[in-house]
Amino acid sequence: MNKLTTFLLMAAFITFGLLTTQGEARAKAIELKFGHVGAPGSLFLACADEFAKRANAKLGDQAKVVTFGSSQLGKDQELLKKLKLGTIAFALPSTVMSSVVDEFGVFEMPYLVLDRNHMRKIRDEVFWSMIAPKVEAEGYEVVAVWENGFRNITNNVRPINTPADLQGVKLRTPKGEWRVKMFKAYGANPTPMALSEVFVALQTGVIDGQENPFTQIFSQKFHEVQKYLSLSGHVYTPAYLLTGKKTWDSLPADVQKILKDEAVGMQEWVYETAEKMETDLLNKMKDSVEINEVDKQAFVDASGPIYQEFGTKVPGGKDLIDKVQALVK
């Protein structure tokens, strides 16, 4: 074999090796599966897709966020398990987080969060320092605080004006301890159920009603099988961009930074989008359901025992409530 042939063979092997290495690098781009329960038209889906768009534009070939809505990857509890196992990268839980860490239950206190400006203060001055760190011991990491929204009651029995009108109403709630306690205190018969099961349960009369933000009510088509929408606004529920510690700690630092920056950076976009959707969707539902205002003071007056129990049962619960309420001033 002459020198020229040897040189050409070596060059070919080097070129092949470089191409193979580059191909393998591209093949190793990390797929970050993002599962959530939001249906088309929901705030959850809008937020997940916006995050994927923003993050993927910055991640290049390093990683890619891929979203799966409508409970395709599981219901809330199943998604939490998959996060911990590392089989998915992100989820967007809301009320269910109070079953993971007790302190998240503060967001189940009725009429505690007054508006989005109040929520901004709670997020920045209470949540990140007093609540978010506690999920790490459970195998999770909160990346950002987004929104589920202000919750309102729909049902097929009667318009709800005061807690007394809820007497005996079979009302679907999420699987959160304090939401169940709250509606029991109001006289309803709360029935915890996964979001994906609610439409059929309403349609068949297994339950009489449910409570959710407008974006969930409309996107899940609950207004099509309900007679009354009562504007209770009884609870504001955040949603949390959540990842598993196993997945998060395995990501390169620069990928973590991009994901964190984009998730936190779109928090204002989330609030603005949610506010616009509230107005638009209420108008769209006016022809489908009978809408009424409620006597909010009557609900506030009936909520005292829930605050008291949370304050005594959850370590530091009263202090947490006090700090949140102090931010109104």
Tell where the protein language model's regions lie, with residue ranges.
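N-terminal secretory/targeting leader peptides
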Residues: R26-H118, F127, P133-K329
